[in-house]
Amino acid sequence: MLKPGDPGGSAFLKVDPAYLQHWQQLFPHGGGGPLKGGGAAGPLGAPQPLQPPPPPERAEPQPDSLRPRPASLSSASSTPASSSTSASSASSCAAAAAAAAAAALAGLSALPVAQLPVFAPLATVAAEPLPPKDLCLGATSGPGPSKCGGSGGDGRGVPRFRCSAEELDYYLYGQQRMEIIPLNQHTSDPNNRCDMCADNRNGECPMHGPLHSLRRLVGTSSAAAAAPPPELPEWLRDLPREVCLCTSTVPGLAYGICAAQRIQQGTWIGPFQGVLLPPEKVQAGAVRNTQHLWEIYDQDGTLQHFIDGGEPSKSSWMRYIRCARHCGEQNLTVVQYRSNIFYRACIDIPRGTELLVWYNDSYTSFFGIPLQCIAQDENLNVPSTVMEAMCRQDALQPFNKSSKLSQAPQQRSVVFPQTPCGRNFSLLDKSGPLESGFNQISVKNQRVLASPTSTSQLHSEFSDWHLWKCGQCFKTFTQRILLQMHVCTQNPDRPYQCGHCSQSFSQPSELRNHVVTHSSDRPFKCGYCGRAFAGATTLNNHIRTHTGEKPFKCERCERSFTQATQLSRHQRMPNECKPITESPESIEVD
């Protein structure tokens, strides 16, 4: 950094008057008055030194200390300097370097300068090697010691301009090495490539939607991306926002449907779409895959037709709603409304839970007896869209159980709120209004919803009594009651049903006693008299009459009986069973 010294130095520059005028405009606040471009500035021995401008962070020099020398003095003063050729050459180089440094500091390198002569003493000092740290620019007016901050021959202090080597290098060459680093305002474009169109677009794909929707459908896991499951139709992009496609938790199945948001209890999903098949075609064995097959019944419980959703191009996304393996994971039940199949949420389904459907809690309808659910409210809203929550009160009245299931079907009343929230819907088919006569009764302001009997085809398709087949694991049973016990872990009130007729019993012993009435032959014969009996228990009781064995003994009176029923009747009689008492001992009196 250049620092001003004491006045009276011997080194000065002859500067053009235009340069001085511009200098005065840059520093108008100086305390020494205006700069003057010509005229004598005092005697030759005491010229005013030229002080280059400091950088903005340093103290500004006083303008009145800058006094240019006249032209006559320049030529006269240059006479002593012409004594040595080498010194003149060195002084020219040093003066050029000092002028370039001053111009770089003031930012005035474009201003014209007439000539830059310096005195010989300055050249002598500048020709010396630069010090390692500080550079001293100046001269002495006479012989004497020449060092920074020293004194000349006249005893006065010699002005020195001090700057470090780093500062000089910065002001001379620093701006040439400066590089402007532009701000990286470029942001990478999002990946808008549509994998289905195989095309890069500026925005989202107009046909297949944004990329996040595709990720929501096919999943983002590496396993799913490495080996995607087959059978991905194009219409899967039409999934409603309430659900999304997922990997099914049921073993052996690729896809499933899970809840994308919380689904309230009572939400209706449907209708189920598929191909209508006549019962004769299904019973003939033309349909091999019955996994997506539903039955439609009329008001009398007669099978009308089947809805087959096995073909993806003619069905909807509801075909991927799988059947529950047990009652614990079931969250949807099947409801038939007129000639359509709907799924209804029987519990609140959390987000991320797979939708699994199964039959309602009355499995009697599963075996050929359709239930009639009578809605007590005329304002029953049946959705026509894919999914609509109806916000109903789930107050279900108990069944009106009949003693004989073969004579009259059970009835179940579903109570809906008087002011259902949401929107009102009218169920319309593509071909027009649905038939209004189906599932309606004569009672005013009541509507009948027949629950579907998905495997009541066991009544017709598997007419033979030993071919009862499970719709989940395809396991066959010899009796329908065995299939019923296999399907439902919570048995109804009468789970034991006769394989020869439609009667059912609550205890297995009652069923065994009833089965004997269907058989005319008596396979159990007595070995003593040859009499035949229908049951083994009856034969054993008869044999005791020949042997005289009485294994049943009363603990009170110690009487024995042949059958347990005889002992029970004996204990119930008040006067027949008397405890045995010992006679009192006789007392001898002397």
Curated annotation (Swiss-Prot):
Source organism (scientific name): Bos taurus
Region spans: Disordered: 25-87
Subcellular location: Nucleus
UniProt main location, coarse: nucleus
Family: Belongs to the class V-like SAM-binding methyltransferase superfamily.
Family matches, as Gene3D superfamilies: Classic Zinc Finger, SET domain
Cysteine disulfide links: none
Catalytic activity: L-lysyl(20)-[histone H4] + S-adenosyl-L-methionine = N(6)-methyl-L-lysyl(20)-[histone H4] + S-adenosyl-L-homocysteine + H(+)
Domain called SET: residue spans: 241-360
Biased segments, Low complexity type: 71-87
Record-listed E.C. numbers: 2.1.1.361
An example Gene Ontology molecular-function term: histone H4K20 monomethyltransferase activity
Record protein name field: Putative histone-lysine N-methyltransferase PRDM6
Biased composition range(s): Gly residues: 29-42
Keyword annotations of the record: Chromatin regulator, Metal-binding, Methyltransferase, Nucleus, Repeat, Repressor, S-adenosyl-L-methionine, Transcription, Transcription regulation, Transferase, Zinc, Zinc-finger
Pfam families: PRDM2_PR, zf-C2H2
Root EC class: transferase
Subunit structure: Interacts with HDAC1, HDAC2, HDAC3, CBX1 and EP300.
Described purpose of this protein according to its UniProt entry: Putative histone methyltransferase that acts as a transcriptional repressor of smooth muscle gene expression. Promotes the transition from differentiated to proliferative smooth muscle by suppressing differentiation and maintaining the proliferative potential of vascular smooth muscle cells. Also plays a role in endothelial cells by inhibiting endothelial cell proliferation, survival and differentiation. It is unclear whether it has histone methyltransferase activity in vivo.
Chain intervals annotated as zinc finger (C2H2-type): 468-490, 496-518, 524-546, 552-574
